[in-house]
Every structure is written in C-alpha cells, then in structure tokens.
Amino acid sequence: MENIEINKKIGELVAKMAKEPNNIEYYHELSELYLEQGNYEKVMSVLKSLLDIAPEDVRALVGMGTLWFYERDFRKSLEYYNKALTINPKNFLIYYNIGNVYAEWKNFSKALFYYNRAIDLNSANSEIYNAIALLYQDNEDYVEAKAYYEKALSINPENVNSLIDLGNVCFKLYEYETALKLFKKVFVLAPDNDMVAVCIANALTVMKDRAQAFAYFEKALTLKGDLYRVYICYAISATEFKDYKLARALYEKAIEINPKKADAYMLLANLLAGTDNIKESIDMYKQALRVEPNNSQTYALLGSAHYLDNDIEQAVAAYRAAISISPDNDEYRLIYSHVMEDYVNSVRGQND
C-alpha cells in the first residue's frame, strides 16, 4: 500500500475513533497501519492508549512485548508477555515469544521449556522447531540442531531460513555434500541471494572444487548484495587454493569498498605475514588499528609481526597495548613474558 493511501486510511480511522473512542478494533487497525509505515513510536503510542481502556487485551500486550523485544529491552518485553500469558495461558505464540526472550538471554533451559510448551499447543508450527534448532546450534549441539531443522522442514519444506541453517549445521558436522545440496536448493528458491551463492562457494572450496567455487563467488558478485563480505569470503577461498596474488587483490577490493571496516585489513595482514611479507603486514595491521584502535587481537598480531621482523622493542610495545585492552588474556601475558625475556637478553647483549 502506498504511503499516501495509508495516510488517508489513518485520517479516516482517527475520525472514526473520535466518534467511538472505546472501539478496540479501531486501535488495532490504526496500529497495523502505523506498523506498515514502520512508525514504531506511533504503534507503541496507539497500543498504550488501547491498554488504558482495555488492560487485558492480549493482542495489544503481545504487540507491546514484541515492540520492546525489537528495542532489545527484554525485561519490558517479558513483563508484557507474562501479563498476556496470565490472561490467555493457551496461546502458543506467547510461549514462543517468551522462549525468544530467554534465548536472547542465553538461558538455554528456560528457552527450551517455553518452546516445548508452544509445541504442546501447536505442534504443526515450523518456526518453533526452527527456534529450538537455533538454540541447540548456539550451544554447539549440532546433532540435535540438525534433528530439529529436519523436523521444521518436514512441515515447511521450502523454508529458506531452515534450509540455510541446516546447511550450516551439516557444514559443522563435516557433511559437506549434504550442505551443498541444501544450499543449492535454497539458491533455486532464492536466486538473488548473494550469501547463498557464497555458502555454495564455501562448500565447494572445502570440497576442493576450485573452478566451481570461484564460479559461484563470481555469481555472488553480480547480485549486488554485501559485496564487502563476498570479496572477503572469495579471498579466503583463494588463500585455501594457494592463489595468494588473487587473494590479495580481493582483500584490497574489499578495503576499497569499505575502508572504514577493519576485517579486510586484518585478513590481508595475516596473508602478508603468512607469505613472508612481514613489513607490509606490519603496515596493514597499523591500518587496521587506525580503523579499530581498541582491538587487542590486532595489537597481538602486530606484536608477532614485529617479533618476526626482529624488532623486539616494538613487539614488546604492541603486546603491552594488547594486555592493556584485554588484561585477563593469559595467552597475551604468556607471549609477552617470552618476548620481554628476549628483549632483556638483547639489551644485556648490547651492554656486554
């Protein structure tokens, strides 16, 4: 619906509400129109007004809970969902939404409890099984995750998200051929999805099919999606095939597309360090730090590069910076102690 038409309907509805201020259905219609416009403040305002006159309206309570959920205020979200649940304890959607809140809080057992209650009330809803699968996936229990994705797909075989997520789980389980089949099925359903093309290319990379992998990366580049991410994944694949010249060019292209993100600088620096271009890698780590100055990992890698370049003093300084940002990182402290020992020995050697 065009915005002009929506505004016209809003005006007509507001006029009706002036005559019938206690007509609950008008409030719901108005909130849906504002939702269609993406005006979430207005949606919240309308639902609050509705709850003033009908405090036990479950639809409004769930709506408020969902709005606060997307605002990432999960406590307020849960408050509204719980109130809705006391009024209607047989609504599967409320249990599902509460499960989502606990999933965001990484409370596995409570999230699973509420998702299972939702299934008790509606066992034919694929999204609930998908949510449980994601829960297990986040817990790195890929076998259970796979089982729930398969259940979700038995209900809705063309659910693109379930197919992609199942493909990713199969990838984690080293079932690369199965993952590839799933990703290709998704690509038939969503041929304009650049990230699906990348998933296919990544699977082909692991399966050592360079020509096909590169063909899908090239296809992804034509889809005009997240080109920065595509170039980075393409570069990683090129590195796997030991085509370091191509990998470097692809990282440089990613940097050209978004010079304010640190990932490509970091990965290119790692590539340069791994191919004995130490001084260039040092420069690239420094560029990454200009973009993201408080990254302890970058300082640690810079320290390693300086150490390989026999510049012990600069290595010490870089590791100190890493420790100052991440003081609880034992690995940084251990490496720093070894580098510091070398530094002390080198100073002693100069003084002898």
Region spans (language model):
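Register position in tetratricopeptide repeats
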Residues: 36, 70-71, 104-105, 138-139, ...
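Helix-start (N-cap) detector for alpha-helical repeat units in TPR-like alpha-solenoids
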Residues: 24-25, 58-59, 92-93, 126-127, ...
